[in-house]
């Protein structure tokens, strides 16, 4: 729905496939665990990642975001196990981040919890994800500085108006669930991300 409104003037009507309308399958989950609860109950979620302290900032990398992504992956795996659901991480779960350095960092954090999954899961940039989909997509924006906002965008114009190709691809890779991570204050300086955050919070 968001992609249709933001990029196609509402002209792209969602089909509403059964797997997008049915209840999420996680009947059993730990309600005291915030990450597990988010995964078990939300189809679209924005997770605010606080800015790192100045001395902890690294170019094209975000340690805290990588750790939260690893916790999301852990929650997905645990929920499937708790609910007796089969799951193939390499085919059903995908992670999109904008930088190679962040790809390595995310993989390293996942490896601390699930070494086999860290080897198999596809963690890549939005450009390389074009044309493929997963049941669950985790999209980490990674950036910590205002000047990096432009890196996330690829604005073009078509008949329906201005389209951010990168954001459009990132948020339309998910069949069932989409988790977006980033620094809310920073991302809200971009009009489309501002609208996306509002959309996630309402749904």
Regions found by a protein language model. Give the residues of each.
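Helicase-core coupling region on the C-terminal RecA-like lobe
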Residues: 1-75, 132-134, 169-175, 179-203
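Conserved P-loop NTPase motor core of helicases/translocases
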Residues: 19-25, 111, 125-127
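Short, contiguous acidic/charged loop-to-helix segments that flank catalytic cores in large enzymes
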Residues: 56-64, 85, 126-129, 153-160
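Conserved helicase motor "Helicase C" RecA-like lobe of SF1/SF2 P-loop NTPases
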Residues: 75-125
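Conserved nucleotide-binding/hydrolysis micro-motifs of P-loop NTPases
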Residues: 100-103, 129-130, 143-146, 184-188
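A short acidic (Asp/Glu
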Residues: 101-108, 134-135, 190-192
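Short, glycine/acidic-rich beta->alpha junctions
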Residues: 118, 159-163
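A short beta-strand element within the Helicase C-terminal
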Residues: 124, 130-144, 148-154, 169, ...
């Amino acid at each position: 729905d968001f992609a249709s409104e933001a990029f196609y003037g509402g002209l792209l009507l969602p089909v509403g496939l059964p797997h997008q309308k049915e209840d999420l399958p996680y009947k059993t989950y730990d309600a005291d665990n915030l990450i597990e609860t988010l995964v078990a109950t939300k189809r679209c979620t924005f997770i605010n990642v606080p800015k790192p302290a100045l001395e902890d900032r690294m170019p094209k990398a975000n340690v805290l975001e990588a750790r939260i992504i690893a916790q999301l992956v852990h929650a997905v795996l645990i929920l499937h196990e708790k609910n007796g659901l089969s799951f193939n991480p390499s085919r059903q779960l995908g992670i999109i981040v904008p930088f190679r350095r962040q790809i390595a960092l995310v993989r390293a954090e996942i490896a601390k919890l699930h070494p086999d999954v860290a080897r198999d899961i596809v963690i890549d940039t939005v450009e390389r994800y074009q044309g493929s989909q997963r049941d669950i997509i985790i999209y980490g924006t990674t950036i910590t500085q205002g000047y990096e906002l432009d890196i996330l965008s690829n604005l073009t114009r078509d008949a329906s108006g201005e389209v951010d190709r990168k954001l459009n691809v990132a948020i339309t890779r998910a069949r069932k669930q989409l988790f977006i991570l980033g620094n809310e204050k920073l991302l809200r300086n971009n009009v489309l991300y501002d609208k996306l955050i509002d959309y996630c919070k309402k749904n």
